């Protein structure tokens, strides 16, 4: 088995960079590895139109490290008031690549999200017309539904109907966490894809809850039982082009995670490809990593794959205990632990 792994430079098809003083840190971490990233729009206030997307994009570009060619791919935040005209203007801007459906209350800064999918059918029709993907946080949010069941219930109540109602619409089922979602995407038409995070490949809910609550493993959708983890590993390493890399790297300041009511999100951007390599190596599937990380996503979005490469070496190193996050700190996933793969820094 080789101790070096060279891949076409990957892209991240789902990331949270936040805004303001933290951008030089979050953008620096993603730009270290990835050429492009789909930028989540759940700011306060959210990114609701092409003008707001353009302004956020400029802030990201201004935060890039010197010499970086990192390209942010912007996303609109759908609300009950998003119009077909908003979608067409976003497409015409040339900088917006998708629109995001957050069920209201599903995750961080989703209170402005969609209260009923029926409310945005005209906007979804416009997405299908202009060829812009719909990105879906696939969880129901009703209080009586168990948090571990919310993804499956979303499939049964909404996702099947959505795919049937809009047969030409490209749909990304984001950060899938269940065997149910993996099966749904596998059996769906070719216009339905999914992203999978590193944490959902490497961990299950036991890692978060057994022996004490570990807040830095807490994300939404929440980690599930190990049988679902196995199904996600099967999907990611299958070579099926429907599945591609999306870190959902989502930083929160340490005090917001280590709290009586802590925020959801794992920060993985600083070492994401190294973690994915670890997961794929566990399955003896390192030969499938380039497809998952570098080829399937661009193909789904109708974009060219990158032509430059990165190289990983099998070399243990210790993840930092914390990282700068504006004037505060963020505790990354795997803080203080050994990682088995290291990115050669001359790739940056």
Swiss-Prot record:
Entry binding sites for Zn(2+) 1: 14, 16, 100, 248
Cofactor binding notes: Binds 2 Zn(2+) ions per subunit.
Catalytic activity annotation: (S)-dihydroorotate + H2O = N-carbamoyl-L-aspartate + H(+)
Cofactors, names only: Zn(2+)
Sequence intervals crossing the membrane: none
Cellular component, GO, one term: cytosol
Gene3D superfamilies tied to this protein: Metal-dependent hydrolases (3.20.20.140)
Family as reported in the entry's similarity comment: Belongs to the metallo-dependent hydrolases superfamily. DHOase family. Class II DHOase subfamily.
Protein name (record): Dihydroorotase
Native source organism of the sequence: Pseudomonas putida (strain W619)
Gene name in the database record: pyrC
